[in-house]
Amino acid sequence: MEWWSDGEKMSMNHLTRRNKNRGYMKLEVWQKAIQLLGVIGNTLSQEARVDFKLRSQILDSAQSVSSNIAEGYCRRSVKEYIQFLYIGLASMGETMTRLIGLKTLHQITSQQFERIDALHYEIENKLLKLVEALEKKRDRGDWIDRLSEPKEETR
């Protein structure tokens, strides 16, 4: 599998090394969050007007999205998973607020902003849907909090 980041082909060989703990890598929302980080990083690297501290803060908040999706997934608890997804959503808000600031200060162009915003919006909606689905699973009791399959009852 390969992703495209600003026209640059990126190898995704790490996806061939699979186990249950790396299952988050199959989530489209995680893949898109990684893509967003790449798009933001490439955009900001082209703009000398953006100071280092602000660039670092934006990249940190953007990277926090995929990191929280992964950490929540790996916790195995639906309650913790949902909590980490909410943290990811908060990081989405922080990232967007900083990007709006850059646009307002004319440190990125409207075209650059729109490109990022479209991807950001898509990820935000996918995160919201994932939270809703997990909350339903939690409420129905359909979540298994263990790596191994539960043993079937013998009759």
Model-derived regions: residue spans:
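Amphipathic alpha-helical assembly/interaction segments
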Residues: M1-R155
